[in-house]
Design a protein with these regions (language model features):
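Active-site pocket-lining/capping segments in soluble small-molecule metabolic enzymes
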Residues: 8-162, 170-330
Length: 330
């Protein structure tokens, strides 16, 4: 299977970039808090005649034993039933949904978890997927829910292409560690071996390139979820990175020196270069960010990169309310 995509075509809206008009698919995190942003962007692009762009979202309800990474977005009053209805609402709007079950340490003894199985059953629809960190869980889902797309989580941080070739029969899509974003020859080889539609690249990883605790951090979060140690989980997800890296920032003499600390966030030009290479699937993380930052990242990587910022402003502020103002004027 491959990532859902919308066939490309000529855009009726003019763009200011020479970027190839090839299809691109965006897997956008923070689905619980980002509903308005993603659905509005999809609707606007469609009405403006901008073809070739499709969306999937990902997130997970809190308190899931199979969870890993940092997808747990607690929303006041949310239950697993309301989360499942959110998935259904995205699907109704033509946006597929990836559940996040990326725990790295799932074993056979954990597969009977009622809460996680309930979520798999309730969200089981064509086009939806599961982001997985355990091969044991991946085989379990493949056997019992064969229509789910299986997305291999980047939390393993495997940089050797052979690892992905060895597991090509189990997963539909591989989310690659951000280190590989800069290795064009490796990406080209993987495109030739696996196909571009099976590779997904994260564009806005804010983790520092030289971070020495990255893997340990993800391992501990997986263990906290598996052991229902929610006090540890809160400690690992609330200001953990800020505390771990505080010393390097206190050593900076001026705010402008922040630019010297490199992370893995890509520029618009780097995204264009990856598209030229053949990459068509991109991941936009939105973990633990306010709605304002969520919108900024979507604007930067999608709307502004396509040269549509002014068009979208006019669309939102003039075209959409036109009937209302015309009615008041009459």
């Amino acid at each position: 299977m491959s990532q859902e995509s919308v066939p490309g075509g000529q855009r009726s809206a003019q763009t200011s970039t020479d970027e190839p008009k090839s299809p691109e698919h965006w897997n956008i995190g923070g689905a619980i808090n980002g509903f308005q942003h993603v659905t509005s962007a999809k609707s606007a692009l469609e009405q403006l005649g901008v073809g070739g762009i499709s969306f999937t979202v990902y997130d997970q309800h809190f308190g899931m034993k199979w969870a890993g990474g940092r997808p747990h977005s607690f929303a006041a009053g949310q239950t697993k039933e309301t989360f499942a209805r959110l998935v259904q609402e995205y699907n109704r709007r033509g946006i597929t949904f990836n559940l996040v079950f990326s725990n790295l340490f799932i074993e056979e003894k954990h597969l009977g978890d009622k809460r996680c199985n309930w979520m798999l059953e309730r969200c089981y629809r064509e086009g939806n997927g599961v982001i997985v960190g355990s091969h044991v869980l991946a085989r379990y889902i493949r056997d019992r829910f064969p229509d789910y797309r299986l997305i291999h989580s980047l939390t393993h941080f495997h940089k050797d292409p052979q690892y992905y070739y060895d597991h090509a029969d189990l997963y539909d899509v591989f989310v690659l560690p951000p280190h590989l974003n800069y290795r064009a020859k490796v990406l080209q080889e993987m495109i030739e071996r696996l196909g571009a539609e099976r590779l997904e690249l994260l564009v806005n990883e804010t983790c520092f390139r030289e971070c020495s605790i990255r893997q340990d951090h993800y391992d501990l979060i997986s263990k906290a979820c598996l052991e229902d140690d929610w006090d540890l989980w809160e400690d690992l997800t609330s200001g953990f990175c800020q505390r771990a890296h505080a010393d390097r920032f206190t050593r900076l003499e001026e705010p402008k020196d922040v630019k010297r600390i490199k992370n893995f966030t890509l520029s618009q030009d780097e995204v264009r270069d990856l598209k030229t290479l053949g990459i068509c699937n991109f991941k936009l993380a939105n973990r633990q960010v306010p709605a304002q930052q969520y919108a900024k990242w979507m604007d930067y990587y999608i709307i502004d990169r396509l040269g549509l910022s002014t068009t979208m402003y006019v669309y939102d502020n003039y075209y959409r309310p036109a009937a209302h103002f015309a009615g008041r004027a009459s």
